Structures are given as C-alpha cells and as structure tokens.
Swiss-Prot record:
Organism: Gallus gallus
PANTHER family: OS03G0429900 PROTEIN
Protein's cellular compartments: Nucleus; Nucleus, PML body
Region Disordered, annotated ranges: 112-178
GO BP annotation list: DNA replication; double-strand break repair via homologous recombination; meiotic cell cycle; nucleotide-excision repair; protein localization to chromosome; telomere maintenance via telomerase
One of the Pfam families matching this protein, by short name: tRNA_anti-codon
Protein name: Replication protein A 70 kDa DNA-binding subunit
Length: 614
C-alpha cells in the first residue's frame, strides 16, 4: 500500500484552517513529566514539507507509544485533533484519535526533506490545495485506506465533527468577551482559558468538613458532552454560589477553572483530569443542546466483578432479580439512622450480585416488575464474596434508554428468567426470596481451586455428615457477652480471661466442631462454630458441656445420632499457613435442612445444561 503525506497540512492547521484526517509522519516522541498524573507524550511530526513539535498525544492514546506502535518514522492518519492556544500565544495540537497506516520498519526513514515550521511566519505549501478546494461534504473514511498513486487525504472538514447538531462554537462570558467552546476530551492542565458546553449528569449534596486546618464545604458534579465526561468540584464560596444555580440534567456553558489530575479512588468518571471551580469560573445556562448525551456508562460484567479489586469504582447493569425490604441502621460515625435496601442484580453472564442502596434511593426503589438497573460509580466490596455499594456520588437509572438495557431485557424475558443464577455475593443473615448462592459440588469447589487466591471464596453445597470429631469440640470461654476468648482455670474457683483482663466465677461453653461432609463426588473437612455446631448436634453447648461431665455415654449418643444427616452448607474457604504448612481451611457460615424442591430444580437444570453440551 502506497501512502502519501498530506503536504502543507501542518501550516494549514497552525493557521486555523480546517484539515480533514491529515496523513503525517512521526519523527520523534518524547515523554513529559507530569508529577503524579499519567505521562504525556510530545510528538514531532512531519507532513513532508514541514515538521512541528507542538503535537501532544491525548492520554488515552498513550498505549500506542508504550507498546511501540507509534514510533519514529511510522506514518499515521490523524482522525481527530484539537488546537489549543497557550497564554504566550503558541498553539498546541492535541491528537485525540489516530490510526497507524505504516509501521516504522515498513517506512525505514524520514519521508522527503521537511524543514521546521516557524509559527511566526507563513510557510509555502507548494503542493497543498487551499481550504476552499475542499469538497463541501467530504467522504467519510472507513479505515481501509487505498491511496496508491493518488493524492493523500487533505483537509478539509472540521477536525471535530459531531454527527448531530452541535452547540454554538462560542459563547459570551459574563465579562462580555467571546470564548470558544471546546470538547471535554481536549481539556488539560496546560490550558488557562476554555469553555465547555456540557450536561450535568450527577449532582452531589453540599458536604462540610472540619479538621486542624479549618473547615469548609464542597459539592461535586459530573459533566458530559459528545467527546467525554469530567468531574467538577466547587468549594466554599463557589459552592454557595453555584449549588442553587446548577440543576441535574440541565446543560450549561462552563468557563475557566483549575484542571488537575483526577483522584480515581473517588470517582468512576473516565477522565484523567478534574475541574475545580475558582473565582473566575462562570456558569451560563444553554437552552439549545438537546444533542448532548445524558449519563455515560462503561459497564463491567457481573462475572468480572469476582476479579475486580476491592474498593474499585465500576459501572454495572443488570436485571433486578429480587430485592429486600428497607431496613434502618445507625451509622456509628454520625450516630445517624439511615435507610438501607439490598437489590440482587443478574446479567447475561448468569451471575448475580447484591447491590446496596442507601437513603432516599433505598426508600423510593421499586423492583416489583424486575426492571433493568444501571448503576454508575458503585464501589466494589469484598464482604462475603463480592458485592456493590451505591455511593452518594453514584447514579442509579431504572430502565435506561440504551442498547445494553434493551438487549438485557430481551434476553431476560426470553431465557434469562428461567436460568439458575449463581451469586457472587454472600448475604449474611439469610438471603432474599429467589436468590441462589454459588452452588457447587465438593469436587467443583476443589477443581476450581476456590480459596487459593488472595481472597476467601464462598460457595454452597449439599453434603452428608460422615464423621464428627468430638475430641476438643468445645471449650470454656469468657462469659462476657461480646467475648468468646478461652479462659484459664485458676484452680481457685475463678476463671481468667486474658483479653478482658478479668477474672470470673463462671464461664460459658463455646463449640468448635470439626466434621467431614461428603457428596457423590468428594469429601471435605469443615469447621462448624457455635450456631452451626448446635444445629448439627441438636443440642445447646451448655447442655452438652454438662452432659459430658455427667453422662459420657449419653454424650457419645448425641454424636452418633448426628452422623449421616444431610444438610445445605454455606462454606467459606481460604488458604491458610500454619507452621510453614499451607492448607485450605473450610468454615461453615450456615447450616440448614435441605430444601429438596429447590435442590431438585437445580439438579434438573444441571442435567439439561449437560445434555445440551453433549
């Protein structure tokens, strides 16, 4: 494939002309230090006539350099770029999107004899047509460029096209000056004067803080336009000024503000930077911007959450398989009562996750018709497997108008509602109606190496008790309500608890029963603590402690009668190391009678799946 450079394109760009997908050659790339932020790359490029070092790579294109796809002498087509003016009048060209047409080894060196472009004087463009020579409606490029023996694509449509009608290209600021509107994607800390036209997709409440350095207030918003999204925060006087002015889902012109590297720990917004309002910031309503999108999502599959790090901020979409009633809890930090509701979401991966709604979101939620729920900015928790918490900065959309939602609804109505879904969340204290846990056979749990990662794993199984180890199955514990530490018999009628640093005239019995459970394929040693052990043995720890002292034979019979009973077990497995020896420790979190109706349904569903595989 023969490719020609867009001769004269650099001069046209720097003189403010519209250039359509110019073909340029990379002469050199250089990393620029940005402190704690992602690296920025400055690119020296050539159009065959001139070279220019004022090209900057947008951070989303960094992998092209880091993977050595964009290197010295390669030829690329610039699909989208933004020209920014600096305080000193110099121009910087931000490369937003490009395709590498020829790699460096295919080219072998510099094309032509280009000379540096001098921004202070116009350059001759001997072979470049003028902007007026461009067609009014340039053909869309499909990426399959075939230009052998023909002129390379030159100019001549706006470098920043939008398929829908766009907002005005400039706006008057409160000071009366005209300010050019730029896309969110072009914002960077090197700019001092800018205006964006964006929709407010999330607005938080005003929050206050107080510490040794003083006190203050703030609120944050999330903004979106056709090029991307960004988070903005107003502090103190700016918070008082802008909070009553800015409304959710409305469109505004935002002019001036400080741009800094975004703290990704607190936001899922896909932007390397965030805005802080300052004394020069202005916010002007825009009445003609119906083309702007609403909330932007970057959905993660529910099955992928199992491998997502704790505290990550993610976007998810799922069918509300079931939901729980609202409960009230008291937040320790503020001693304030808040509402809480768990909803259980599933997607086409067949996995189910528990998401917790808080406050007003929990109160007003209605999942009775199994709606599609999209959550932007949920935090991943590892409490009992994987679960999600909806934050004050999160956005919850019920039945969103999006292709993902339509696809999910169609899948659920046609087949998804009949599937047996496996939960990646372990909901303590029982589960909501219709919610199934992560059912496994003991063989599956071992073959899938559950518990051998950095985090504990959870699964449920149906197992039969085939052995109980009655030796050391109970111990004398501290009688305090919140302490289960083993006490030391002082041999004087008193029992000492090292944890509480007190002596007591009595103690309580606590159980730690080791049992072997088996199914048709494998077996597993499982540790059962107080409630689980008492359920299996059918007696309380207090009764068993007294029985052991008074009637050893009756004590033995309790264990014999507990053998060969079948239960549903909810099990936590984790690799633990003791005395330099590593082994899987399995702990029963819950033990209950088998629900044979549900168990039969699971077996039938499993048989059908295996039959289809065969």
């Amino acid at each position: 494939m023969s490719v020609r450079l867009s001769e004269g394109a650099i001069a046209a760009i720097m003189q403010g002309e519209n250039v359509y997908k110019p073909v340029l050659q990379v002469i050199n790339t250089r990393a620029i230090a940005t402190g704690n932020g992602p690296p920025r790359y400055r690119v020296l490029m050539s159009d065959g006539v001139n070279t220019l070092s004022s090209f900057m790579l947008a951070t989303q294109l960094n992998p092209l350099v880091e993977e050595e796809r964009l290197s010295a002498h390669c030829i690329c087509q610039v699909n989208r770029f933004i020209v920014n003016s600096l305080k000193d009048g110099r121009r910087v060209v931000i490369l937003m999107d490009l395709d590498v047409l020829k790699t460096a080894d295919m080219v072998g060196g510099t094309v032509g004899n280009p000379v540096p472009y001098n921004e202070g004087q116009g350059q001759q463009r001997s072979s470049a047509p003028t902007a007026n020579a461009a067609p009014n409606k340039p053909q869309q490029q499909d990426g399959n460029l075939s230009v052998a023996g023909s002129a390379a694509p030159k100019y001549h449509a706006p470098s920043n096209q939008f398929s829908k009608a766009s907002a005005p290209s400039s706006v008057k600021t409160p000071g009366g000056t005209q300010s050019k509107v730029v896309p969110i994607a072009s914002l960077n800390p090197y700019q001092s004067k800018w205006t964006i036209c964006a929709r407010v997709t999330q607005k938080g409440q005003i929050r206050t803080w107080s510490n040794s350095r003083g006190e203050g207030k703030l609120f944050s918003i999330e903004l979106v336009d056709e090029s991307g999204e960004i988070r903005a925060t107003a502090f103190n006087d700016q918070a008082d000024k802008f909070f009553p002015l800015i409304e959710l889902n409305k469109v505004y012109y935002f002019t001036k503000g400080n741009l800094k590297t975004a703290n990704k720990q607190y936001t899922a917004v896909k932007n390397d930077y965030e805005i802080t309002f300052n004394n020069e910031t202005s916010v002007v309503p825009c009445d003609d911007a119906q083309h702007l999108p609403s909330v932007q999502f970057d959905f993660v599959s529910i099955s992928d959450l199992e491998n997502t790090p704790k505290d990550s901020i993610v976007d998810v979409i799922g069918i509300c398989k079931s939901y729980e009633d609202v409960t009230k809890i008291v937040v320790k930090a503020s001693n304030r009562e808040v509402s809480k509701r768990n909803v259980h979401l599933m997607d086409t991966s067949g996995k189910l996750v528990t998401a917790t709604l808080w406050g007003n979101e929990a109160e007003k939620f209605d999942g009775s018709r199994q709606p599609v729920i999209a959550i932007k900015g949920a935090r991943v928790s590892d409490f009992g497997g994987r679960s999600l918490s909806v934050l004050s900065s999160s956005t919850v959309v019920v039945n969103p108008d999006s292709p993902e939602a339509f696809k999910l609804r169609g899948w659920f109505d046609s087949e998804g509602q009949l599937l047996e879904c496996a939960s990646i969340s372990d909901v303590r204290g029982g589960s909501a109606s219709g919610v199934n846990t992560n059912w496994k056979t003991l063989y599956e749990a071992k073959s899938e190496r559950l518990g051998q990662g950095d985090k504990a794993d959870y699964f449920s199984c149906v197992g039969t008790i085939v052995h109980l180890r009655k030796e050391n199955c109970m111990y004398q514990a501290c009688p305090s309500q919140d302490c289960n530490k083993k006490v030391i018999d002082q041999q004087n009628g008193l029992y000492r608890c090292e944890k509480c640093d007190r002596e007591f005239p009595n103690f309580k019995y606590r159980m730690m029963l080791l049992v072997t459970i088996a199914d048709s394929l494998d077996y597993q040693w499982v540790t059962c603590f107080q409630e689980s052990a008492e359920f299996i043995l059918g007696q309380s720890a207090t009764f068993l402690g007294e029985l052991k002292d008074k009637n050893e034979q009756a004590f033995e019979e309790v264990f014999q009668n507990a053998n060969f009973n079948t239960y549903e077990f909810k099990i936590r497995v984790k690799l633990e190391t003791y005395n330099d020896e590593s082994r899987i420790k399995a702990t029963a979190l819950d033990v209950k009678p088998v629900n044979y109706r549900e168990y039969s349904k699971r077996l039938i569903a499993s048989i059908r799946r295996n039959a289809q595989l065969g």
